[in-house]
Amino acid sequence: MSGKLPAKGKLLPKFSLTTSALQDITNKDLAGKRVIFNIFPSIDTPTCATSTRKFNEIAASLQNTEIYCVSADLPFAQGRFCGTEGLTNVKTASSFRSNFGAAFGVNLTTSVLKGVLARAVVVADEKGKVLHTELVSEIASEPNYDAAINSLR
């Protein structure tokens, strides 16, 4: 990988992402909101699709919290998946033209998946302070959803 996940207790690194509406978002756009970044290689893999569905269910019960499902997929693919699946509680964001992977230390730099993002979860509070991080050790495994949610309590 290209670095280390943001450290717990520190502020999120500066980043930009692109939404399915092709709008760029940055740290400033998330100020005042709690955020969960569900980071993964591609929406077109079964585990990534499953985590997006599960976080969509979780998002329905969270107050003042936005969940961003982040991958290097083009925004069109992300939007198509959520539209087809009827997922309206999560937001998708693409790292395809940004520094996000490097800033969060999740760019895969070796293996057949070189160039996409590792599977990870980063949770931050309303001020952008990191509450929880998880780098999923096996790319085909799901993240620890409970740990992410419990970090918001």
Protein language model features and the residues they cover:
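Chalcogenol-based redox active-site neighborhoods
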Residues: 1-153
